Swiss-Prot record:
GN (gene name): tcbF
Keywords, sorted A to Z: Aromatic hydrocarbons catabolism, NAD, Oxidoreductase, Plasmid
UniProt record similarity statement: Belongs to the iron-containing alcohol dehydrogenase family.
InterPro entries: ADH_Fe/GldA (IPR001670), ADH_Fe_C (IPR056798), Alcohol_dehydrogenase_Fe (IPR039697), MAR (IPR034786)
One Pfam family here: Fe-ADH
Pathway: Aromatic compound metabolism; 3-chlorocatechol degradation
The keyword Iron-sulfur is assigned to this record: no
Organism for this UniProt entry: Pseudomonas sp. (strain P51)
GO molecular function, one term: alcohol dehydrogenase (NAD+) activity
Native organism taxonomy: Bacteria, Pseudomonadati, Pseudomonadota, Gammaproteobacteria, Pseudomonadales
Protein name: Maleylacetate reductase
Entry's Gene Ontology BP terms: 2,4-dichlorophenoxyacetic acid catabolic process
Listed CDD domains: MAR
Catalytic activity: 3-oxoadipate + NAD(+) = maleylacetate + NADH + H(+); 3-oxoadipate + NADP(+) = maleylacetate + NADPH + H(+)
Length: 352
């Protein structure tokens, strides 16, 4: 056995009611002038968070949006400068936390993330921004949240459909982590536990959305899966999703949900060790098919067509994916990638 484990992770507060610790956490971090960030739809949550720290709120920015458009980043940065803030508090999902990351990248100010979905972005130093219909990603320690507060009670309002796709989005992070070059025994255990926790909790959340134990297990799984992604490099799955989301404006979690079984099936012949770990985590001999079935049986989309992809754009998507080779367990083959995209578009079962 020979490996390096150099974890890059924020401080984590976890548990029902943990949001009430926000004021104490800001004092611990020496934070005094907060910009509270949200999407327009989650402004009420932003107000709820601000009410806990009335003396520390410098202002709000409630125009966060999917895929972090560069013009929104510029608008938020201008507001932050005008208010003279010293930090960002980001209650919400990937859109809100993603915007906070881009602001931190340019200002080096700390983030306190309060995730309300299972996307896992809060646990990584990965950032992304969309400019001219192309999504660019990178890594930088400046964008890693200083503290993450997981309060499963905040996920009660997450619609069941979004809960399912957000959970599968998190699973995708850990799946890709299991065949990353940086994987080690510790990350493998975290990935397996995260995948198992989410796979078990998703059906319960769909049938009982306010089941606190299921919501807690899902956030626990999201924390683990996000932590794995934060310590490994990304490969085919995330490349596909960034291309489809950033260029064709497909919804983030739904795109991950649709693509995951197909990207895994493509790589399966080249990842025997990771496949064995996945078989154990999902209690199945066919992990790719099991993930397809998990999505379909819980009402999640299984086709790109159903989430807004146009058939006429499949060729362009394939060209974009093939335009820059990058590390992947199985070399990228244009004909095979085109077939993968076609199956994902139609919602057909995954194939190697």
């Amino acid at each position: 056995m020979n490996f390096i484990h150099d974890p890059l992770t924020p401080r984590v507060l976890f548990g029902a009611g943990r949001l009430q610790s926000l004021g104490e956490e800001l004092k611990l971090l020496g934070i005094r002038r907060v910009l509270v960030i949200s999407t327009p739809e989650q402004r009420e949550l932003a107000n709820q968070v601000a009410a806990l720290i009335p003396g520390s709120v410098a202002g709000f920015f409630d125009r966060a949006t999917m895929h972090v458009p560069s013009q929104i980043v510029d608008q938020a940065a201008s507001v932050a400068r005008e208010l003279g803030v010293d930090s960002y508090v980001a209650p919400g999902g990937g859109s809100t936390i993603g915007l906070a990351k881009m602001l931190a990248l340019h200002s080096s100010l700390p983030i306190v993330a309060i995730p309300t979905t299972y996307a896992g972005s809060e646990m990584t130093s990965i950032y992304g921004v969309t400019e001219n219909e192309l999504k660019k990603t990178g890594r930088d320690r400046r964008v890693l949240a200083r503290t993450v507060i997981y309060d499963p009670e905040l996920t009660f309002g997450l619609p069941t459909g979004i809960s399912v796709t957000s959970g599968l989005n998190a699973i995708a992070h850990a799946v890709e982590g299991l065949y990353a070059p940086e994987v080690n025994p510790i990350l493998a255990i975290m990935a397996q536990q995260g995948i198992a926790a989410l796979a078990k909790s998703i059906p319960t959340i769909r049938s009982a959305p306010t089941d606190l134990e299921a919501r807690s297990q899902a956030q626990y799984g999201a924390w683990l899966c996000g932590s794995v992604l934060g310590n490994v490099s990304m490969a085919l799955h995330h490349k596909l999703c960034h291309t489809l989301g950033g260029t064709f404006n497909l919804p983030h979690a739904e795109t991950h949900t649709v693509v995951l079984p197909h990207a895994l099936a493509y790589n399966t012949p080249a990842i025997p060790r990771a496949n064995a770990w996945l078989q154990e985590a999902l209690a199945t001999r066919e992990p790719a098919q099991a993930l397809f079935d998990l999505a379909k049986s819980n009402g999640a989309p299984v086709s790109l067509q159903s989430i807004g992809m146009k058939e006429a754009d499949l060729d362009r998507a394939c060209e974009l994916v093939m335009s820059a080779q990058y590390p992947n367990p199985r070399p990228l083959e244009k004909h095979a990638i085109a077939n993968l995209l076609r199956r994902a578009y139609l919602g057909e079962p995954p194939q190697p």
